[in-house]
C-alpha cells in the first residue's frame, strides 16, 4: 500500500512539474517588451491607431508594447511573421482582412485558419474613394460616365492588391460595368502621396485622407460601409448608390497558434480595457473607426466564416488561384 501511495504521489508531482513552467509563465506574464506587428508602413492610419492601442495596453500590462512595421504584400506579412514566432505572447500582430483573401489568390507561407490565435477584435475601418479637389469628377455618377467613355484610363491607388480598398472598388466597377486601372502601393502613406502628387486620379483607402477632405484638398466621392459615417454624413455609401458593395474589415490582436490560454486571457482583457481609454476613443473618432469588439471565441468564429466568404468574393471577381 505504501509503495502504491508513493507511486501515485511521485506521478502527481511529475505531472505538476510538467505543468509548472506554463503556469509560472502565465502567472508572471508579461515580464518583457511585447512586439505588436503592424503590416502597414509608419504614418498610415492603421499605424497611428495601433500605436495608441499599444501605448494604452502597455500601461495596463505594465510593460512596453512596441509597434514593428512590416509593410508590403497587401498586409499579410504580419501573418508570415507570426508563423515563425514563439507562442509565448510576446509577438502579436494585426491581421487585416487580406489574410482571408490573399491565400485564395496566391500561395502564402501561412494557413489562415490553423496558424493563428485570434485574441480579440477591437475596431474596423471606414473606407472611401477620394479624388483631388480640382478633379473634374465630382461624384460616383460622373466617375462611372467618364470610365465608360475611357475604359481602363481611370487610375486609382490602394494600399495593396487584395486589400479591402482594392476589392471593394473592383466589386463596384464590376457592378457598374466599368474597367478601372488599379495601382497598388505598400500602404496608405504612399497611396496618399500618389493622389496628392497627381500620379493617380483617385485613392481608395481607409481614412488617412480624412483631414485633407475636411481641409478641402480632397473630395470624398463615397464610403463603403453599411451606413453613412457620422463625420461625413452628407456622403452616400456605395451600397446606398445601388452598387451592393459593403466593406468595414474588422481587426484587432492576434498571435501564433498554440498560445497558453491563460496568456491569451491576459492579453484579451488588457486590450479590451483599452476600448475605454480616452486616448483610444479619440483616435478612433479621428479616423472615424467604430468599435467592433469580439472576444476570442467570437473572433475565431468570425475568422472561419470570413475565410469561406472571401473565397466566394475572390471567385466572383475572377481572381481565384486555381493552382
State each model region's role.
Residues 1-14:
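N-terminal secretory signal peptides and thylakoid transit peptides that target proteins
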Residues 25-115, 153, 161, 178-204, ...:
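N-terminal (or domain-start) structured segment
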Residues 31-33, 174-178, 259-323:
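An extracytoplasmic/periplasmic, membrane-proximal ligand-sensing/linker region
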Residues 43, 97, 132-137, 158-163, ...:
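Short coil/turn segments
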Residues 84-90, 104-190, 238, 248-283:
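Hinge/capping helix and adjacent helix->loop/strand transition within the periplasmic-binding protein
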Residues 124, 209-276, 305-308, 322:
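C-terminal lobe and pocket-closing loops
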Amino acid at each position: 500500500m505504501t509503495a502504491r501511495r508513493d507511486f501515485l504521489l511521485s506521478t502527481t508531482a511529475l505531472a505538476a512539474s510538467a505543468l509548472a513552467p506554463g503556469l509560472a509563465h502565465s502567472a508572471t506574464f508579461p515580464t518583457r517588451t511585447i512586439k505588436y506587428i503592424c503590416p502597414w508602413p509608419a504614418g498610415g492610419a492603421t499605424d497611428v491607431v495601433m500605436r495608441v492601442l499599444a501605448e494604452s495596453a502597455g500601461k495596463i500590462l505594465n510593460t512596453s508594447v512596441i509597434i514593428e512595421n512590416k509593410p508590403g504584400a497587401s498586409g499579410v506579412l504580419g501573418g508570415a511573421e507570426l508563423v515563425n514566432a514563439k507562442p509565448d505572447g510576446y509577438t502579436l500582430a494585426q491581421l487585416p482582412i487580406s489574410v482571408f483573401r490573399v491565400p485564395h489568390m496566391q500561395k502564402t507561407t501561412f494557413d489562415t485558419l490553423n496558424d493563428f490565435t485570434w485574441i480579440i477584435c477591437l475596431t474596423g475601418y471606414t473606407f472611401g474613394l477620394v479624388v483631388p479637389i480640382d478633379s473634374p469628377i465630382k461624384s460616383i455618377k460622373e466617375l462611372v460616365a467618364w470610365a465608360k467613355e475611357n475604359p481602363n484610363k481611370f487610375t486609382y491607388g490602394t494600399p495593396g492588391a487584395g486589400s479591402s480598398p482594392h476589392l471593394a472598388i473592383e466589386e463596384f466597377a464590376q457592378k457598374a460595368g466599368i474597367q478601372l486601372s488599379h495601382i497598388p502601393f505598400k500602404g496608405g502613406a504612399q497611396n496618399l502621396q500618389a493622389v496628392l502628387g497627381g500620379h493617380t486620379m483617385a485613392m481608395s483607402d481607409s481614412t488617412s485622407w480624412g483631414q485633407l477632405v475636411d481641409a478641402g484638398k480632397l473630395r470624398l466621392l463615397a464610403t463603403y460601409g453599411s451606413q453613412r459615417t457620422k463625420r461625413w454624413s452628407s456622403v452616400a455609401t456605395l451600397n446606398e448608390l445601388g452598387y451592393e458593395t459593403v466593406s468595414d474589415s474588422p481587426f484587432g490582436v492576434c498571435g501564433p497558434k498554440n498560445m497558453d490560454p491563460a496568456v491569451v486571457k491576459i492579453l484579451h482583457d488588457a486590450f479590451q480595457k483599452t476600448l475605454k481609454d480616452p486616448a483610444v476613443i479619440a483616435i478612433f473618432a479621428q479616423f472615424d473607426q467604430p468599435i467592433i469588439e469580439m472576444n476570442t471565441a467570437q473572433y475565431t468564429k468570425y475568422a472561419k466564416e470570413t475565410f469561406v466568404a472571401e473565397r466566394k468574393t475572390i471567385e466572383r471577381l475572377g481572381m481565384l488561384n486555381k493552382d
